[in-house]
Amino acid sequence: MHQNIRNIAIIAHVDHGKTTLLDQLLQQSGTFQKHEEKKERIMDSNDLEKERGITILSKNTSIKWKEYKINIVDTPGHADFGGEVERVMSMVDSVLLIVDALDGPMPQTRFVTKKAFKYGLNPIVVINKIDRKNSRPDWVINEIFDLFVNLNANDKQLDFPIIYTSAILGTSGINYLDMKENMIPLYEAIIKYAPAPNVDPNQKFQMQISQLDYNNYLGVIGVGRIKQGHIKPNDSVVIIDSLGNTRNGKINKVLNYFGLKRLEIQKGDAGDIIAITGLNKLNISDTICHPDNLCPLPPLIIDEPTVNMFFSVNTSPFSGKEGKYITSRQILERLKKETIHNVALQVKETKDANIFSVSGRGELHLSILIENMRREGFELEVSRPKIIFREINDIKQEPFENIILDIEEKHQGNIMKFIGERKGELKNITVDPNKRIRLEYLLSSRALIGFRTEFMSITSGTGLFYSSFSHYQKYQKNDIGQRKNGVLISNSTGMAVAFALFNLQERGKLFLGHGTQVYEGQIIGLHNRSNDLTVNCLTGKKLTNMRASGTDEAIILTTFTKFTLEEALSFINDDELVEITPKSIRLRKRYLKENERKKANRDRTTIVD
């Protein structure tokens, strides 16, 4: 039975067509019936994934083609979700590497491919978007070969099969000049080159939990690949955690994937990827085995977090007006629940019961969590993201990242100046036929906080930016990543009025418009100078009973800046917070009253002296 199973992971950079290709594989294999609704981007189930066009959680699907069953696991492309990638590799026997026929391999591709090689998996390379204007498949294949050599691939991994596809047109072929009007060449390549799982169906049952899900009806759902034996509903099992502790349990239901549905089955066989219910308090990496076969599998290793933030209860004067969940207990419960399946996330309580330290793989990793909490109705405050330093042989070290910037030629000077200020080290420059320039840099992770926002503004939204973790090296003492300008701070609570805002415009750039409710200590704009300025944005025009002589100035407000969550996080300094509610994102000073801020500054200066 297990000879007809193929378990493969899909690796692709953001926007190289991974999800669209999966849609075609599902539809052309007949996994979807004619009457079923066919949506685009089927695999991206989370609202944020659909909006941003990125995959955050790894997901499973299964395709029946002829007598074969192909289990496909979708992996996130971002290094920020590396915790997801690690677990996927432990479930599969081969990887499908999807690369854009024009762009070639990118840093995120490199990150996941490196993990795949670490697990000894052989790639099947899919050159997608072959229908793109100016596509250059031969150049892309050379780039992929160079990438594999840099990643220390073995001879078998370097001798990779290549399939050309256009996911949007539903065509594929082994020669890009002779494409078939279907996906059959790709199905055949998967069956031929992906090995059947190396499992033993005759031994006693054993599997490792690689993913967790939760359902209100079924409770905790553990997902993994059966390493040996088989499993049926109501079987008694033993759970062994990563520390070697054991406890008994009983399987309730055994579920299998078909298309995007999870269906109940009467027996799960060796080599297949299944889901089980009935076992509470499961953790990633737990081994589930037969009571007569207490043999734990090696625990999965997850990359350490690189970024830390503080989440706290909303203490602003507007607390509780817009959200449902506002207490420290509710926030902590939600964060603890997130750590069950989001294993790269670490949550610690601090001395203050209202503040929690949250560490993750990157700015994006944490901002996705905050955005999800916000949509669920939470109110909270968060601090500026900080890089986690390491002490190695008593030397303070910080993480560095490889970044690739794809920009138009006219922006090159400004971008190089901008990265020079952030102490970036230029590694390579290439110019492509479309007069776009690709710059490769080595840059401290500290310098990357707030980088994306500034980069997009310099390139007028036309630039592409990718980063992946490189290594730790000696900490360089400098103030990169800190904002140079001060801010405009409201001196009282009330409604901002156009007359006051009009007079403040010459002082800086405003973050709100007429009629917005503000409170004392809220940041309402960016000052033109380097110091903070406390201002009054509530004063209306003084009215008299004298008739106006027609000399009144027309009050015209310039468009104010509205922050997204990521922009707000990267904008604030260490003495500021972002207040997040389901309806608003506000910036504020940590100390709302001006005399408290002055006292805190004096104390800080005394400590430095």
Swiss-Prot record:
One of its GO terms (cellular component) is cytosol. This is Large ribosomal subunit assembly factor BipA. The gene is bipA. A 50S ribosomal subunit assembly protein with GTPase activity, required for 50S subunit assembly at low temperatures, may also play a role in translation. Binds GTP and analogs. Binds the 70S ribosome between the 30S and 50S subunits, in a similar position as ribosome-bound EF-G; it contacts a number of ribosomal proteins, both rRNAs and the A-site tRNA. Residues 3-198 form the tr-type G domain. It is found in: Cytoplasm. Monomer. It catalyses: GTP + H2O = GDP + phosphate + H(+). It comes from Buchnera aphidicola subsp. Schizaphis graminum (strain Sg). Keywords: Cytoplasm, GTP-binding, Hydrolase, Nucleotide-binding, Ribosome biogenesis, RNA-binding, rRNA-binding, tRNA-binding. Its EC number is 3.6.5.-. Its main location: cytoplasm. GTP binds at D15, H16, G17, K18, T19, T20, N128, K129, I130, D131. Belongs to the TRAFAC class translation factor GTPase superfamily. Classic translation factor GTPase family. BipA subfamily.
